[in-house]
Amino acid sequence: MLFVMLPRRSLRVLHTADVHLDGDVGGSAEQQLAYRERGRAVLRRIVDRALADEVDLVLIAGDLFDHNRVPDTTLAFVQAQLDRLRQPVVILPGNHDALYTRSIHDRHDFSAGAPHVHVIRRLDGQTLDFPELEVSVWGRAMEEHVPTFQPLANLPSRDDRRWSIAMGHGFFYPERQRPDRSSPIFADEVRDSGWDYLALGHHHVRTDVSQGRVAAHYPGAPMEGSSPGTILRVDFSTDDGVRVSSRPLD
């Protein structure tokens, strides 16, 4: 496959996933409340980092929420945080906040009054174009987390006139096989896509699954363990290509 690098503007992206707001961790009511508040603090710091780093685009690659039963107060909090941003934000539903009937995204439209917020809703995949940034973002919404759902199925050919970013939420397989895990992402799909960057979610540890000339990364869960957590900053330029670095949430 021939990769052609046409001149394009530089681009700076924040990539996160697996925030799992309002996760059920068991314990007392006080422990549950403390965990909820910690999750909210993490999302605030993600937005703070996007503003401090002056990113052009924010990608949330699945499982922003831990389940579809979160209360309206959590939805209002998330909306308030998204409203702090003015750059485009793309949200991909994951397996915990999948796009089935009565999902979070049926209850609340995060783009209402916030046209910079975009939720991937098409089950067969959709492309969002941002001409001012010279970037296209593709993703496929998840309705069911099953082995037959392939997050990168129907990925179209890249547009060489723009940066091409695909989003996916699922389990990575280094080789083709009959998947025993749901929502499989195969190494050859990554390699053969030819896209500039694959913004992935589901693995809770930062993982580089780049294949050939295609950069593909899981940022890890920003609330995993007791450390402050990190996100990924992805810098695109025609001179240096795609550079990925961890940024702390402190």
Segments from the language model and where they lie:
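N-terminal active-site segment of His-dependent metallophosphoesterases
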Residues: 1-77, 160
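Residue-level signal for beta-strand positions within conserved beta-sheet cores that form or flank
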Residues: 9, 133, 240-242
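Residue-level signal for pocket-adjacent positions within structured domains
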Residues: 16, 217, 244
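Generic beta-structure capping elements
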Residues: 16, 140, 169, 247-249
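Short, charged, solvent-exposed linker or helix-capping segments at domain edges/interfaces
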Residues: 25, 148-151, 242-246
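His/Asp/Glu-rich metal-coordinating catalytic cores
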Residues: 57, 67-229, 235
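C-terminal functional module detector
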Residues: 224-250
